[in-house]
Protein backbone atom coordinates (compact mmCIF):
# COMPACT_ATOMS: atom_id res chain seq x y z
CA UNK A 1 0.00 0.00 0.00
CA UNK A 2 2.87 2.36 0.86
CA UNK A 3 4.61 1.57 -2.43
CA UNK A 4 1.43 2.27 -4.39
CA UNK A 5 0.96 5.67 -2.71
CA UNK A 6 4.59 6.64 -3.40
CA UNK A 7 4.26 5.71 -7.08
CA UNK A 8 1.01 7.67 -7.36
CA UNK A 9 2.59 10.68 -5.62
CA UNK A 10 5.66 10.68 -7.88
CA UNK A 11 3.49 10.25 -10.97
CA UNK A 12 1.32 13.16 -9.85
CA UNK A 13 4.43 15.31 -9.26
CA UNK A 14 5.74 14.52 -12.76
CA UNK A 15 2.33 15.29 -14.24
CA UNK A 16 2.25 18.69 -12.53
CA UNK A 17 5.79 19.43 -13.67
CA UNK A 18 4.87 18.53 -17.25
CA UNK A 19 1.79 20.76 -17.12
CA UNK A 20 3.85 23.68 -15.82
CA UNK A 21 6.60 23.17 -18.42
CA UNK A 22 4.14 23.12 -21.33
CA UNK A 23 1.74 25.79 -20.04
CA UNK A 24 1.23 28.73 -22.37
CA UNK A 25 -0.09 30.80 -19.45
CA UNK A 26 3.41 31.30 -17.99
CA UNK A 27 5.03 34.72 -18.41
CA UNK A 28 7.78 32.99 -20.39
CA UNK A 29 7.15 29.67 -22.12
CA UNK A 30 9.65 26.98 -21.09
CA UNK A 31 8.65 23.85 -22.99
CA UNK A 32 10.46 20.54 -23.18
CA UNK A 33 13.05 22.04 -25.50
CA UNK A 34 13.58 24.75 -22.89
CA UNK A 35 14.71 22.08 -20.43
CA UNK A 36 17.61 21.45 -22.80
CA UNK A 37 18.04 25.09 -23.80
CA UNK A 38 18.52 26.63 -20.35
CA UNK A 39 21.50 24.58 -19.07
CA UNK A 40 23.34 24.52 -22.41
CA UNK A 41 22.88 28.26 -23.04
CA UNK A 42 23.99 29.12 -19.50
CA UNK A 43 27.05 26.88 -19.81
CA UNK A 44 28.06 28.43 -23.14
CA UNK A 45 27.50 31.98 -21.86
CA UNK A 46 29.38 31.53 -18.57
CA UNK A 47 32.38 29.78 -20.14
CA UNK A 48 32.49 32.38 -22.94
CA UNK A 49 32.56 35.29 -20.48
CA UNK A 50 35.28 33.67 -18.37
CA UNK A 51 37.39 32.74 -21.41
CA UNK A 52 36.93 36.15 -23.04
CA UNK A 53 38.15 37.88 -19.90
CA UNK A 54 40.78 35.59 -18.42
CA UNK A 55 41.72 32.57 -20.59
CA UNK A 56 45.50 32.02 -20.91
CA UNK A 57 47.15 31.89 -24.38
CA UNK A 58 46.27 28.91 -26.57
CA UNK A 59 48.60 26.90 -28.81
CA UNK A 60 46.12 27.14 -31.68
CA UNK A 61 48.54 25.99 -34.44
CA UNK A 62 49.86 23.09 -32.38
CA UNK A 63 53.50 24.23 -32.70
CA UNK A 64 54.02 25.62 -29.20
CA UNK A 65 53.47 29.24 -30.17
CA UNK A 66 50.55 30.26 -27.92
CA UNK A 67 48.20 33.00 -29.09
CA UNK A 68 46.75 35.35 -26.49
CA UNK A 69 43.03 36.09 -26.83
CA UNK A 70 41.63 37.31 -23.51
CA UNK A 71 41.31 40.78 -22.04
CA UNK A 72 43.67 40.09 -19.14
CA UNK A 73 46.41 38.98 -21.53
CA UNK A 74 46.82 42.24 -23.42
CA UNK A 75 43.75 42.51 -25.66
CA UNK A 76 41.01 45.13 -25.80
CA UNK A 77 37.30 44.67 -26.46
CA UNK A 78 37.89 44.70 -30.24
CA UNK A 79 40.85 42.31 -30.41
CA UNK A 80 39.81 39.97 -27.59
CA UNK A 81 38.52 36.57 -28.67
CA UNK A 82 38.11 32.98 -27.57
CA UNK A 83 40.94 31.25 -29.44
CA UNK A 84 39.92 27.95 -31.12
CA UNK A 85 40.99 24.55 -29.85
CA UNK A 86 44.55 23.56 -30.78
CA UNK A 87 45.35 21.82 -34.06
CA UNK A 88 47.07 19.19 -31.90
CA UNK A 89 43.60 18.12 -30.71
CA UNK A 90 42.13 18.04 -34.22
CA UNK A 91 38.52 16.86 -34.24
CA UNK A 92 38.76 14.85 -31.02
CA UNK A 93 36.24 15.64 -28.32
CA UNK A 94 38.24 17.38 -25.61
CA UNK A 95 36.30 17.65 -22.33
CA UNK A 96 38.09 18.70 -19.17
CA UNK A 97 38.51 15.12 -17.93
CA UNK A 98 40.43 14.16 -21.10
CA UNK A 99 43.28 16.54 -20.18
CA UNK A 100 45.99 15.72 -17.67
CA UNK A 101 45.34 19.00 -15.87
CA UNK A 102 43.26 22.14 -16.10
CA UNK A 103 46.35 24.04 -17.30
CA UNK A 104 46.77 21.62 -20.21
CA UNK A 105 43.08 21.90 -21.09
CA UNK A 106 43.33 25.70 -21.19
CA UNK A 107 46.63 25.63 -23.12
CA UNK A 108 45.02 23.44 -25.81
CA UNK A 109 41.93 25.65 -26.12
CA UNK A 110 39.39 23.39 -24.44
CA UNK A 111 36.99 26.27 -23.61
CA UNK A 112 36.38 26.96 -27.33
CA UNK A 113 35.08 23.47 -27.99
CA UNK A 114 33.00 23.54 -24.82
CA UNK A 115 31.41 26.88 -25.78
CA UNK A 116 30.72 25.94 -29.40
CA UNK A 117 29.12 22.56 -28.74
CA UNK A 118 26.91 23.85 -25.92
CA UNK A 119 25.97 26.93 -27.97
CA UNK A 120 24.93 24.85 -30.98
CA UNK A 121 22.80 22.56 -28.83
CA UNK A 122 21.23 25.67 -27.27
CA UNK A 123 20.24 27.26 -30.58
CA UNK A 124 18.85 23.95 -31.86
CA UNK A 125 16.78 23.72 -28.67
CA UNK A 126 15.68 27.35 -29.08
CA UNK A 127 14.47 26.58 -32.60
CA UNK A 128 12.63 23.52 -31.28
CA UNK A 129 11.10 25.68 -28.53
CA UNK A 130 9.81 28.10 -31.18
CA UNK A 131 8.11 25.21 -32.97
CA UNK A 132 6.76 23.83 -29.69
CA UNK A 133 5.18 27.15 -28.66
CA UNK A 134 3.75 27.64 -32.17
CA UNK A 135 2.20 24.17 -31.96
CA UNK A 136 0.71 24.82 -28.51
CA UNK A 137 -0.85 28.08 -29.71
CA UNK A 138 -2.19 26.56 -32.93
CA UNK A 139 0.10 28.64 -35.13
CA UNK A 140 1.86 27.55 -38.30
CA UNK A 141 5.57 26.61 -38.03
CA UNK A 142 7.11 29.36 -40.18
CA UNK A 143 8.88 31.13 -37.28
CA UNK A 144 11.26 28.21 -36.58
CA UNK A 145 11.67 27.72 -40.34
CA UNK A 146 12.89 31.33 -40.62
CA UNK A 147 15.15 30.91 -37.57
CA UNK A 148 16.71 27.86 -39.24
CA UNK A 149 18.68 30.26 -41.48
CA UNK A 150 20.93 31.73 -38.74
CA UNK A 151 21.07 28.28 -37.13
CA UNK A 152 22.39 26.84 -40.41
CA UNK A 153 24.92 29.69 -40.73
CA UNK A 154 26.23 29.16 -37.17
CA UNK A 155 26.46 25.41 -37.74
CA UNK A 156 28.39 25.95 -40.97
CA UNK A 157 31.13 28.17 -39.51
CA UNK A 158 31.40 26.55 -36.07
CA UNK A 159 30.98 22.84 -36.85
CA UNK A 160 30.83 21.90 -40.55
CA UNK A 161 33.89 23.95 -41.53
CA UNK A 162 36.13 22.49 -38.79
CA UNK A 163 34.96 18.98 -39.74
CA UNK A 164 35.74 19.59 -43.41
CA UNK A 165 39.16 21.09 -42.64
CA UNK A 166 40.03 18.40 -40.11
CA UNK A 167 40.44 20.47 -36.94
CA UNK A 168 38.53 22.73 -34.59
CA UNK A 169 41.47 25.13 -34.88
CA UNK A 170 40.00 26.19 -38.25
CA UNK A 171 36.68 27.21 -36.69
CA UNK A 172 35.60 30.83 -36.41
CA UNK A 173 37.12 32.63 -33.44
CA UNK A 174 34.61 34.00 -30.94
CA UNK A 175 35.32 37.72 -30.98
CA UNK A 176 34.96 40.85 -33.09
CA UNK A 177 38.33 40.93 -34.85
CA UNK A 178 38.40 37.12 -34.74
CA UNK A 179 35.25 37.01 -36.87
CA UNK A 180 36.77 39.42 -39.40
CA UNK A 181 39.99 37.41 -39.42
CA UNK A 182 37.99 34.27 -40.23
CA UNK A 183 36.24 36.03 -43.10
CA UNK A 184 39.43 37.53 -44.55
CA UNK A 185 41.33 34.23 -44.40
CA UNK A 186 38.36 32.30 -45.82
CA UNK A 187 38.48 34.39 -49.00
CA UNK A 188 41.95 33.42 -50.28
CA UNK A 189 41.73 29.82 -49.12
CA UNK A 190 38.41 29.11 -50.83
CA UNK A 191 37.91 31.99 -53.29
CA UNK A 192 34.54 32.68 -51.70
CA UNK A 193 33.89 35.86 -53.72
CA UNK A 194 33.62 33.72 -56.86
CA UNK A 195 31.25 31.16 -55.34
CA UNK A 196 27.65 31.42 -56.63
CA UNK A 197 26.12 30.43 -53.28
CA UNK A 198 27.97 33.28 -51.58
CA UNK A 199 26.64 35.66 -54.24
CA UNK A 200 23.09 34.48 -53.53
CA UNK A 201 23.74 34.94 -49.80
CA UNK A 202 24.91 38.52 -50.31
CA UNK A 203 21.82 39.26 -52.40
CA UNK A 204 19.66 37.75 -49.65
CA UNK A 205 21.19 39.76 -46.80
CA UNK A 206 21.44 43.12 -48.55
CA UNK A 207 18.19 42.63 -50.42
CA UNK A 208 16.43 41.72 -47.18
CA UNK A 209 17.77 44.89 -45.54
CA UNK A 210 16.60 46.99 -48.50
CA UNK A 211 13.12 45.46 -48.58
CA UNK A 212 12.78 45.79 -44.80
CA UNK A 213 13.66 49.49 -44.98
CA UNK A 214 11.27 50.03 -47.89
CA UNK A 215 8.44 48.22 -46.12
CA UNK A 216 8.98 50.04 -42.83
CA UNK A 217 9.09 53.44 -44.48
CA UNK A 218 5.94 52.72 -46.51
CA UNK A 219 4.02 51.54 -43.43
CA UNK A 220 5.12 54.62 -41.51
CA UNK A 221 4.24 56.97 -44.36
CA UNK A 222 0.85 55.66 -45.50
CA UNK A 223 -1.75 56.85 -43.01
CA UNK A 224 -5.48 56.24 -42.91
CA UNK A 225 -6.33 59.91 -43.18
CA UNK A 226 -8.68 61.13 -40.47
CA UNK A 227 -8.21 64.85 -41.08
CA UNK A 228 -9.39 67.34 -43.65
CA UNK A 229 -7.23 68.56 -46.51
CA UNK A 230 -6.38 71.77 -44.68
CA UNK A 231 -5.05 69.89 -41.65
CA UNK A 232 -1.83 67.93 -41.34
CA UNK A 233 -2.14 64.18 -41.93
CA UNK A 234 -0.17 63.70 -38.71
CA UNK A 235 -2.80 65.38 -36.55
CA UNK A 236 -4.25 63.00 -34.00
CA UNK A 237 -1.57 60.36 -34.38
CA UNK A 238 1.17 59.57 -31.90
CA UNK A 239 4.21 57.35 -32.11
CA UNK A 240 3.54 53.79 -30.95
CA UNK A 241 -0.25 54.05 -30.78
CA UNK A 242 -2.25 50.80 -30.78
CA UNK A 243 -4.73 51.76 -33.51
CA UNK A 244 -3.72 50.66 -36.99
CA UNK A 245 -3.01 53.47 -39.43
CA UNK A 246 -1.53 51.47 -42.31
CA UNK A 247 -3.34 51.68 -45.63
CA UNK A 248 -2.10 48.97 -48.00
CA UNK A 249 -4.11 50.43 -50.90
CA UNK A 250 -2.26 53.73 -50.55
CA UNK A 251 1.08 51.92 -50.27
CA UNK A 252 0.29 49.81 -53.34
CA UNK A 253 -0.68 52.89 -55.33
CA UNK A 254 2.41 54.84 -54.28
CA UNK A 255 4.87 52.06 -55.04
CA UNK A 256 3.15 51.12 -58.28
CA UNK A 257 3.53 54.69 -59.53
CA UNK A 258 7.07 55.05 -58.18
CA UNK A 259 8.43 52.03 -60.09
CA UNK A 260 5.79 50.18 -62.13
CA UNK A 261 2.41 48.65 -61.40
CA UNK A 262 3.39 45.05 -60.75
CA UNK A 263 6.41 45.90 -58.58
CA UNK A 264 4.13 46.37 -55.57
CA UNK A 265 2.06 43.88 -53.57
CA UNK A 266 -1.67 44.32 -53.13
CA UNK A 267 -1.89 41.41 -50.69
CA UNK A 268 -0.45 41.73 -47.19
CA UNK A 269 0.22 37.99 -46.74
CA UNK A 270 2.17 37.64 -49.98
CA UNK A 271 4.14 40.78 -49.11
CA UNK A 272 5.19 39.49 -45.70
CA UNK A 273 5.95 36.02 -47.05
CA UNK A 274 8.30 37.65 -49.56
CA UNK A 275 9.96 39.74 -46.83
CA UNK A 276 10.58 36.58 -44.80
CA UNK A 277 11.56 34.24 -47.63
CA UNK A 278 14.09 36.47 -49.41
CA UNK A 279 16.71 36.79 -46.62
CA UNK A 280 16.05 33.29 -45.26
CA UNK A 281 16.70 31.61 -48.61
CA UNK A 282 19.76 33.83 -49.12
CA UNK A 283 21.25 32.83 -45.75
CA UNK A 284 20.43 29.17 -46.44
CA UNK A 285 22.50 29.39 -49.61
CA UNK A 286 25.33 31.18 -47.78
CA UNK A 287 25.42 28.40 -45.17
CA UNK A 288 25.34 25.81 -47.95
CA UNK A 289 28.22 27.59 -49.67
CA UNK A 290 30.33 27.56 -46.48
CA UNK A 291 29.52 23.87 -46.04
CA UNK A 292 30.60 22.96 -49.57
CA UNK A 293 33.77 25.05 -49.31
CA UNK A 294 34.51 23.30 -46.01
CA UNK A 295 35.37 20.24 -48.07
CA UNK A 296 37.34 22.40 -50.55
CA UNK A 297 34.67 22.58 -53.23
CA UNK A 298 35.72 26.18 -53.73
CA UNK A 299 34.61 29.15 -55.81
CA UNK A 300 35.42 29.47 -59.51
CA UNK A 301 39.10 30.03 -60.22
CA UNK A 302 39.98 31.29 -63.71
CA UNK A 303 43.70 30.58 -63.68
CA UNK A 304 44.20 31.12 -67.42
CA UNK A 305 44.68 34.81 -68.07
CA UNK A 306 43.51 36.50 -71.25
CA UNK A 307 46.38 37.23 -73.65
CA UNK A 308 46.54 39.72 -76.50
CA UNK A 309 47.97 38.92 -79.97
CA UNK A 310 51.51 39.57 -78.70
CA UNK A 311 51.14 37.24 -75.72
CA UNK A 312 50.84 39.98 -73.13
CA UNK A 313 48.43 39.46 -70.23
CA UNK A 314 45.22 41.47 -70.21
CA UNK A 315 44.36 41.69 -66.53
CA UNK A 316 40.83 40.75 -65.61
CA UNK A 317 38.98 40.96 -62.32
CA UNK A 318 39.81 37.28 -61.78
CA UNK A 319 43.56 38.04 -62.04
CA UNK A 320 43.32 40.87 -59.53
CA UNK A 321 41.33 38.64 -57.20
CA UNK A 322 43.90 35.85 -57.47
CA UNK A 323 46.75 38.25 -56.65
CA UNK A 324 44.88 39.64 -53.66
CA UNK A 325 44.13 36.12 -52.45
CA UNK A 326 47.79 35.12 -52.70
CA UNK A 327 48.86 38.22 -50.78
CA UNK A 328 46.34 37.64 -47.99
CA UNK A 329 47.29 33.97 -47.75
CA UNK A 330 51.01 34.75 -47.48
CA UNK A 331 50.35 37.28 -44.71
CA UNK A 332 48.21 34.79 -42.85
CA UNK A 333 50.74 31.95 -42.96
CA UNK A 334 52.86 33.42 -40.21
CA UNK A 335 54.51 30.08 -39.41
CA UNK A 336 55.05 28.77 -42.94
CA UNK A 337 58.81 29.23 -42.62
CA UNK A 338 59.03 27.72 -39.16
CA UNK A 339 59.16 23.91 -39.18
CA UNK A 340 58.38 22.51 -35.70
CA UNK A 341 61.67 21.71 -33.97
CA UNK A 342 60.39 18.55 -32.31
CA UNK A 343 59.82 17.08 -35.79
CA UNK A 344 62.98 18.49 -37.37
CA UNK A 345 65.43 17.15 -34.77
CA UNK A 346 66.52 13.57 -34.41
CA UNK A 347 66.15 13.60 -30.65
CA UNK A 348 62.83 12.95 -28.97
CA UNK A 349 61.60 16.13 -27.32
CA UNK A 350 59.64 15.95 -24.04
CA UNK A 351 56.00 16.97 -24.34
CA UNK A 352 54.82 19.70 -21.96
CA UNK A 353 51.68 18.63 -20.12
CA UNK A 354 51.28 21.96 -18.36
CA UNK A 355 51.04 25.45 -19.78
CA UNK A 356 54.33 27.35 -19.70
CA UNK A 357 54.58 30.40 -17.47
CA UNK A 358 53.83 33.61 -19.35
CA UNK A 359 56.27 36.40 -18.57
CA UNK A 360 54.47 39.55 -17.43
Swiss-Prot record:
Gene3D superfamilies according to UniProt: Photosystem II protein D1-like
Gene coding for it: psbA5
Transmembrane segment boundaries: 29-46, 118-133, 142-156, 197-218, 274-288
Places the protein is found: Cellular thylakoid membrane
Keyword Endoplasmic reticulum: no
GO function term, MF aspect, one: oxidoreductase activity, acting on diphenols and related substances as donors, oxygen as acceptor
Job description of the protein: Photosystem II (PSII) is a light-driven water:plastoquinone oxidoreductase that uses light energy to abstract electrons from H(2)O, generating O(2) and a proton gradient subsequently used for ATP formation. It consists of a core antenna complex that captures photons, and an electron transfer chain that converts photonic excitation into a charge separation. The D1/D2 (PsbA/PsbD) reaction center heterodimer binds P680, the primary electron donor of PSII as well as several subsequent electron acceptors.
Site, as annotated: Cleavage: 344-345
Organism: Nostoc sp. (strain PCC 7120 / SAG 25.82 / UTEX 2576)
Lineage: Bacteria, Bacillati, Cyanobacteriota, Cyanophyceae, Nostocales
Name of the protein: Photosystem II protein D1 3
Cellular component terms per the entry's GO annotation: photosystem II; plasma membrane-derived thylakoid membrane
PROSITE patterns in UniProt: REACTION_CENTER (PS00244)
One GO biological process term: photosynthetic electron transport in photosystem II
